[in-house]
Amino acid sequence: MSNIADRDPHAWRVPRFFAVAGIAILLTACANSQRMRTMQELQTTADARTVSPAFERYTKQTLLDGLWKRPQLSARDRSIVTLSVLIARNQTVEMPFHFGLALDNGVKPAEISEMIAHLAFYSGWANATAAAEIAGHVFDQRGIGDGELPAADVELLPLNEVTEKQRAEAVQENFGQVAPGVVQYTTDVLFRDLWLRPGLAPRDRSLVTVSALVANGQVAQIPYHLNRAMDNGLTRAEASEVLTQLAFYAGWPNVFSAMPAFKDVLMKRPS
């Protein structure tokens, strides 16, 4: 940072401002760290029982010994769905645990890296920034280096020109005069770049997107992306069980809001 000119009568305020700001940031970081430690302590069985015995029982019996062991969806897919919810809703307290669990369940570091990049577009840059910081700590603890992560620029997967042409024309017709910038970025960055990155399989990329949409109650976008997910290999049984997983991590109201859209898609697709 360049120095303020000595003749500026207010120059002394600048370093003082940054000193105060630095202290404030440090105190905030300490407070956040303490808050995260406190919340993580609440996740222990004893603390959960002390605060809410019912919550502790549901966590152990219904969630961990029940939901996560259901065979209709692999543990890996459950981790992808759950992480997508946490990132999309910026629920950072549980991220360290679930980043670690995802790695244990077979989600590769490269796939987590791509999930964060993908969700920057579908849930916002700030949410992805927060997730990247926490994932970085988990990667460091596990000795995961840059060599295991996708490069910024990669050879993209082949594009289905026919399908993309149909999508682009529909979006241009509907919204080209409303927000041409959004339409242009949607084509150039999302569907001709992001969705073609090979570090996350198209099925999994769709799974991430659908999970984020349900988690944030963005029902209008579900039909397109659920159809795309199933075109990319997600089965009807898996789509159904994704909703079951999401009920616990995104909440029952969001899932019930999404179910009519899921029902409509499933009924219109060939069995």
For the regions a language model picked out, list residue spans one by one.
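Bacterial N-terminal signal peptides that target proteins for export
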Residues: 4-19
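Bacterial N-terminal signal peptides
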Residues: 18-28
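Acidic, glycine/proline-rich low-complexity segments that act as flexible tails and inter-domain linkers
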Residues: 30-76, 89, 94-97, 104, ...
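Aromatic- and histidine-enriched alpha-helix N-cap/loop-to-helix transition segments
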Residues: 75-79, 110, 202-206, 217, ...
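Short, structured motif recognition centered on aromatic/hydrophobic residues
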Residues: 78-86, 95, 115-116, 205-213, ...
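Hydrophobic/aromatic-rich structural module bridging two neighboring secondary-structure elements via a short loop
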Residues: 98-130
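Preference for long, well-ordered alpha-helical segments
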Residues: 127-128, 218, 238-257
